[in-house]
Structure formats: C-alpha cells, structure tokens
Amino acid sequence: MKKLLLSLWALSLTTFVFAAEHTAFSPDKRLHLTVRDDGGQPTYTLNYNGLEVIKPSKLGLKADYGDFTQGMKIVEATEKAVQTVYDMTRTKRAHVDQKATMLTLKLVNDKGYPLQITFYIANNDVAYRYTLLPVKDENPRCAVIYGETSSFNFPDETRTFMTPQIQPMSGWQRTKPSYEEEFVPDARLTDKSKYGVGYTFPCLFRIPNKGNNTWILISETGTSSYPGCRLSEYEPTKGYHIAYPQAGENNGFGSEFASIPLPSSTPWRTITVGNSLQPIVETTIPYDVVEPLYTTQNDYKPGRYTWSWILWMDESCNYEDQKKFIDVAATMGYEYILVDALWDKQIGRKGIEALANYAKSKGVSLMLWYNSNGTENDAPQGPRNIMSNSIARKRDMAWMKQLGVKAIKVDFFGGDKQETLQLFQDILSDANEYGLQVIFHGCTLPRGWERMYPNFIANEAALASENVYFTEYFARQEAFQLTLYPFTRNAVAAFDWGGILMNHHMSKDNKSRHQRFTGDIFEMATAITNQCSVNCVALTPNALEGLPDFEKEWLKQVPTTWKDLRFLAGYPGKHFAVARQTTEGKWYAAAISAEEQPISMTLHLPMFAGKEVKVYADGPKKAGSLWLTPGMKRQKIGKNGLLKVIVQPRGGVIVNE
C-alpha cells in the first residue's frame, strides 16, 4: 500500500512539472474548462453538461521577441469568483448582473519570458485573452504580435453557420472586405469557404447530439486599437485558428500585425454555449468583459430616422427631396433624418445649413454621411478625405455641432488592420467632443463598442437592406437573412440593418422594378427582432400615403431602446421570435418567418397573461395579389400566457398592449 501511495505521489509530481492541468467551472457548474501545458504546448478543452463541445485546442501567440506557442510551462494559477454589474442604454439588456469565475494563468516560455492567459467563465459564456507581461529587465518595452495559435476544435459532426472573408481590394470600387458576404447555413466543418481566406466573426456552430443540439457562438470583443481578427479555414483534427488581417487590405498600406506596448492585452475571444439558442440570442458577453474608455457629458438620444437614399438613391440627395423626408419624419414623430452621400456636391454646405434650420423648425435633427477615407479604396462618394484626417475631421465636427447635427454615418472602411481599428476609435472619441453619435457602414464588426464608447450607435457589418433594393435575388433572400442575423450578427452587437422597408416595389414611384417579397407586418416586426438604438424606418412620402392607418399608428410609436429580452423560438435562417421590454417597461413580441409554408407557433408570453393585446399579423395573399394581407385584431391572452399564432411565409406577427 505504501508503495502504491508513493507511486501515485510521484505520478502527481511528474504531472505538475511536465503537464500541469488546471480546471475551472462556471458558477452553475455546467461549463467545465480544462487548460494543460502538455509537451510545452498550452491547450484548453471545454465541456458543457458533460459533453465535450470544444476538443483540445491550442493557445499561444508569436511575438517579435519570443515564441509563446511551444516550450511553455504553467507556473502560477489563481482563481476567484467575480460579479460584473453595469447599466447600458443602447443594447439588448439595460441592466446586467453577471457572476463568473476568473482563472488567471501565468506561463513562461523556454527563455523565461512570461505570458498571462485570463479566462472569464460565466454560466453560458467563456472569454479569454492574452497579456504580454514585462520581462525581467523590462526590455523590450514594445512588441509586435505576428499571429496566434489560438484555435477552436469542434467534434467532427458539427455544422456551421458562417459568412466568409473575402480577398482585399476586391468588389465595387475595391472596397472589400466589408463584412457583406452571404451566410451559409448548416454547412459541414470540412466545407471550404467561398474565397479560401476564412470567416468573419461571429461564427455559429451546431453540435448534434442524440437528437438534441448544442449551440456555440464564437466572436471577439474589446478591440480598440488592435487588429480585427477572424477565423481561418478549417483544418481536420486542428479546427479553426485566429487569423489576422490580410496584407493587401487598405491598398496594402499598414501592417497586418499588432504593435503593442508592454504590458498589454489582446482582445477577448468569446465562446457562448447552450443546449438551446436562448443563450446565443441573449448573451451579454461582448460587454461583460470590457469597460467604458471615456465618459461623456452629452445626452445622446435614441430614436428613429428617415432615409431617402435607400429607395430613391443618389439623385435624391438634393435640397427639395431632403425636405420631403424631413416632413415624413415630422409627420411620424421621428427624431432624425439621414442625409446620405454626395450632399457636399448636390446640396452644399450652405444648403445643409438651411436644411438643418428647416429640420429644427419641424422638431427633427440631421444625421450626415461621410466617406471614411481617401486612400484606402476607390469609393468615389463625398465628402472624402475628412474623417481620415484629424484636423479636417474636427473642423467639420465643430461645424456640425453649430448646426445642431446629432450624428454621423461613416462608410467604406474595408479592412481590419490595426490602423483602421484605431481610426474607428479616433472618430468616436472626436465625435464625442462635439456631441455626435456615430454609425459605421461598409466595415468590420463592432467588438464591445456600445459599452466602450458612449456615442457609438451601431455598425452595418452584414449584407443589409440596400441589397434588397439592388437585386431581386437579395430581395428574395431578405427573410432568410433577417431570421439568421438574430443568432449571429445581432447576437454580439447592435446592427444597423438600414431600413424597415414599407414600399411594395423597390423604386421611387413604388410601381416599377422588383417587388418586396416580405409582408408589411414582417417589415414592422424587424423593428423588434433587430436591435439598434437609432433605427431606420425607410418610409417614403408616397409609401406613407398608402399605409393602412393601423400600420401608420404602430410605426409612429416604434420603440428603439430596450430593458430586457426573452428568446421565444427560432432556427437560424428559418424563423425567429423574441419578446423585448422597452426602457419604459412596455413589452413587445414579434415573430418572422423565412419558411416556404405557414408555420404554427405557440408563444409563451407571461407578461401578457390575462390581458387584452393587439395582434398584428400578415395573412395569406388574396387572389391575384403579390403581397400578404396585413391585419390587426384585439385578443385576450389566457392566464397561462400562451398565444398560438400562424406566421405566413416571409410574414410576421407582432403582439403588444
């Protein structure tokens, strides 16, 4: 017996010296993280409810002064319980109170240089990041990170819901990559991406397990002046690894690597896990591990805006047409109008000043469009060469503040390099000094920015509403996209889809070109299913005239800021239902479908139990009609809070008091 105990002690000692292993659990014990340094290669595994959802996956990075991917040894481990409490106004949940386990590991490489890895483990979320610590003699004081071995290795049967990255300086006016490629649902791990250069965040995975599914969402957060990363192509037995920007982005200018001071941390890589899609839709991990980077004295207002360009295009950016859309905003009680590209030539600064005064007389404020650059791509629309230059940028921001302009939309970034991510931060910081909120388009995914920057509204970072106008193909895809984004793009950040489209045809006259294929209630429901604190309602003057009164009245009070949410039902790219509570306490439930046949859904709505509600729904098409038939009725909800609804193909349902 004594010999056996001695052998076990010796084995334990050997394991500690050559293959240290550390485990940590989520507060509810369902997530189980294990980190090892076996063979000098740090790896982690992740189990959820006893199922290995991420197989052994590599950790580590390579810097100019040291290799932290091999010859590594864990020399110190600390674990503590943490509680994250904060309030926000521009995301899916206004108050967050999150408990988690924090595991901090200190490793050294074969030269004795230190690397810290911090894991944040909540009930359905894991986040981790690296911190390069000072070396013993405090030199070097700065470093370049060339890449990471950080990987995500899934079971072989896993299915994917991802959108590919594309080669740089491609597409219209060499503006790509701009995070505007098509998602492919339920693909196999071994399927190659369309362009062969990996995938942009966020990335959704489904692990089938004896008739049940485990869902995993991978993304990153806390990126400010660091490159935006992505997932590589899949490698059998190894999985996906973190990839840095492509060298050709920004017309080849700037490094694809990360330049940092020491000590310094990378962004957090986030993993959300659940046996249903509820944790995916409701996660707050992008905000839980970041902090505000500056405060503000400005009172930034949420709201709704009208936008002529989405249906009337470039030629509408003139003084008279913009007045018409100001009038629409005023009629509907909306706070803003977006004056889009080419205003510098087609309206002029004096014209903008006159428009600002006219809008002010109607209780409406302007938002102005800007090109982000003049050197990174060939997008011709102006104003150009302003937002990329600090002197010109501040000059225009001071002018806008004087006019009462409340926000800017900055477009055509086309890259993830460190200098581009720094430009986002610089624009936001300067805009805050002049009381301006900011929307970014043609650009990367926001990574925790709603909490980091108090004047940030949203990014596009997906195929958005303009494509519904451009081609009939994308018009037919609209329902698919908008039932997919709640589980992917909008799950990790506010999303400027860019327009609740009420025109029946994608044209100024509302009679020509291809039709809209979704129902009116579907479009209205996207104000609930999509989350963005300043939301576009793409009403045109002629579409407004033809709206039924019940639609018009609902659109007048469409909410944009939320206190809470509850996932109700859905499957990515097929259907989605959610309930959201406004900051004033009023609940709205909405369901949309991309299915080819009507679907029956039983919604659990305890907030409406025993109450009379209004149910807005798209009904079947009438004989000879191209469009679903919208309607509204009052209905009493039973004490059990259950409501059975029929959702038409490309149709929607809304429930509110």
Q: Which stretches of residues belong to each language-model region?
A:
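Bacterial Sec-dependent N-terminal signal peptides
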Residues: 1-21
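N-terminal accessory beta-strand-rich subdomains and adjacent acidic, glycine-rich linkers
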Residues: 21-282, 631
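Conserved, mostly hydrophobic/aromatic
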Residues: 130, 329, 411, 438, ...
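An acidic-aromatic substrate-binding cleft motif
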Residues: 257-336
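Aromatic- and carboxylate-enriched substrate-binding clefts and catalytic-loop regions
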Residues: 338-519
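Glycine-rich, aromatic-lined ligand/substrate-binding cores of catalytic
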Residues: 508-583
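Carbohydrate-binding surface patches
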Residues: 571-609, 653-654
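C-terminal beta-strand-rich structural cap/linker in extracellular carbohydrate-active enzymes
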Residues: 633-657
